[in-house]
């Protein structure tokens, strides 16, 4: 087996190789001196921006979680408040209903008592008026009896006429 060079037709000389190495080294030094600093700065800025963006994203995620928890707590609190308001409204409605019923009962009782008192007063007034009329009639009958001396039959007729006059 014979070794064949890759570039069979090309002659590689050491001087050319050294020259290429020197030119490549000079080019590398020029790139390092002129371009490496700005490229390195650009890469560092990019790295810092990525870090800042990741930190901002984490911060935003934490804020979003906090807001979601606050909203959930507020919603739960709102539900509890709504339940409490409904409970209070029912309680107030029941109290108001009971109060209205008790006031109506008290008013009805007062009206009944007043009606009883009015009826008793009317009865008393009617009795007093009847007594006065009976007294007046008695006086009138007595005057007539005294004015004329009546027989028993005349007196009976006179009383009957008087009673008939009361009915009218």
From Swiss-Prot:
Transmembrane annotation, as ranges: 11-31
GO molecular function per UniProt: proton-transporting ATP synthase activity, rotational mechanism; proton-transporting ATPase activity, rotational mechanism
Main subcellular location: membrane
Membrane topology of the entry: Single-pass membrane protein
Signal sequence segment: none
Subunit structure: F-type ATPases have 2 components, F(1) - the catalytic core - and F(0) - the membrane proton channel. F(1) has five subunits: alpha(3), beta(3), gamma(1), delta(1), epsilon(1). F(0) has three main subunits: a(1), b(2) and c(10-14). The alpha and beta chains form an alternating ring which encloses part of the gamma chain. F(1) is attached to F(0) by a central stalk formed by the gamma and epsilon chains, while a peripheral stalk is formed by the delta and b chains.
Family the UniProt entry places it in: Belongs to the ATPase B chain family.
Protein name, per record: ATP synthase subunit b
Originating gene: atpF
């Amino acid at each position: 087996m014979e070794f064949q060079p890759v570039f069979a037709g090309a002659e590689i000389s050491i001087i050319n190789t050294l020259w290429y190495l020197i030119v490549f080294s000079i080019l590398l030094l020029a790139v390092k001196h002129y371009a490496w600093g700005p490229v390195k700065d650009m890469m560092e800025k990019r790295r810092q921006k990525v870090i800042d963006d990741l930190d901002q994203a984490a911060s935003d995620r934490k804020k979003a979680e906090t807001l979601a928890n606050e909203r959930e707590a507020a919603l739960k609190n709102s539900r509890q408040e709504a339940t409490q308001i409904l409970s209070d409204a029912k309680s107030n409605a029941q109290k108001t209903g009971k109060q209205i019923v008790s006031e109506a009962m008290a008013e009805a009782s007062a009206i009944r008592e007043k009606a009883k008192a009015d009826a008793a007063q009317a009865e008393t007034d009617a009795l007093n008026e009847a007594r006065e009329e009976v007294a007046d009639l008695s006086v009138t009958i007595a005057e007539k009896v005294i004015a004329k001396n009546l027989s028993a039959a005349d007196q009976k007729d006179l009383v009957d006429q008087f009673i008939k006059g009361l009915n009218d």
